[in-house]
Amino acid sequence: GTTVVAHKQQSVNRLLYKVTSHIPDTFFSLK
């Protein structure tokens, strides 16, 4: 149902947030 889709979307958003929040650290350390 829609709840499963919403739950998947939420976990995907959380994963994306984790990844994007780590990007600046790695980017600046590479620089």
From Swiss-Prot:
Keyword Metal-binding assigned: no
Keywords annotated in UniProt: Copper, Oxygen transport, Secreted, Transport
Tissue expression remark: Hemolymph.
GO CC entries: extracellular region
One Gene Ontology MF term: oxygen carrier activity
Cysteine-cysteine disulfides: none
UniProt-annotated location(s): Secreted, Extracellular space
Described function: Hemocyanins are copper-containing oxygen carriers occurring freely dissolved in the hemolymph of many mollusks and arthropods.
Family label: Belongs to the tyrosinase family. Hemocyanin subfamily.
Protein name per UniProt: Hemocyanin subunit 1
